Amino acid sequence: MPHCFTFKPASPEGSLGDDHLPHPSPEGSVASTFNLSHELAHAFQTPSYHDIRSRLLVIDPTQENLELFLSQELRPNNESVQEALSLRHAKQTTLTNLVSTYFQHSEDATRFCLNLYQNVHSARCHLYTPLLDLFNIFPRDSHSAIDESFCNLAFDVFLKLDTFENPFASPESHSFQDTQLCFYQLADKLDTRIRKSKSRVRLLHHATAGSALCLVTAVVVVAASAAFIAYHALPTILVVAGPLCTPYLPHSFKKKELSNIFQLNVAAKGTFALNKDLDTIDRLVSRLHTGVKNDKLLIRLGLERGRDVYTIPEFVKQLRKSHVNHTHQLEVLVDHICRWFTNVNKSRSLLLKEILRPQT
């Protein structure tokens, strides 16, 4: 395998800031075999952009190694997620289904991004590094006569590179569309569930206010009746008035719905932010697909012209011009993959924290 050139790190700009998330509810304590303090501390020990990048760039991006990298670097891991959900939600509900779906989609999308890194590595090692080696040898001055040996060398390199398949999927690829569609559908479901929960909270608020008014009215009626009704009749009035003035839904239901809204908001805003990241990555991959396609077209045209000392230098010249731009695009894509990892860890960790937050 040829030696591959490395990238210079770019400045990370996270797209998932704290302002995207709802204000947390008050902290409390919980008694459970599940260590809440330890889990929250571990969840927020998410690797930084530079940590992720430094670890990713040193591994051999085979499928097995990338899967191992995912299991080590994705926070929180599946075990923590399942324990948290089983602790807070004993029964399977719409909320738990949506939250579980968010965690699963974010993991699948992260695996997809790691596969893109594998494609970047393939393009670097099997296309752009051999071209760079050729550029370092081939004379830059196209006006002077080029030695036939250089043209033969370039032609042989073209023969080898012509067999290289474009590692980047076309913009019409189902894999990318399916990944994005999952997030779009999840966003719609979360939005619907949030509206439903908010509607329930408003209903509970009106019911509570109505029951308070009912209680005041009952007290007034009882006081007025006391002047005309014998003492032994008072318990009967209270027995009748009590059920009529009791809130239709207990206050704990309202707290539960508010807790649900907090969790749904974190999941919804995390979904929105990650979808934006996917859109950016999609555009980068699309440009790289076109760039590799055009480079391969130049290589094919060069081969069709044969070992000509006049045309081969022109094709090398054109490939040299596009080389800087395309290798820079590869670097930018790697930056966004590392940024994705940072953002998805932060988003998942914040949702886990909201799930484990005690209801007070």
From Swiss-Prot:
Its main location: membrane. It holds the Pfam family DUF677. GO terms for cellular component: membrane. It comes from the Eukaryota. Keywords: Membrane, Transmembrane, Transmembrane helix. It is a multi-pass membrane protein. The keyword Methyltransferase does not apply. It is found in: Membrane. The keyword Lyase does not apply. Residues 1-29 are annotated as: Disordered. The chain crosses the membrane at residues 205-225, 229-249. InterPro entries: DUF677 (IPR007749). Belongs to the UPF0496 family. This is UPF0496 protein At3g19250. It comes from Arabidopsis thaliana (Mouse-ear cress).
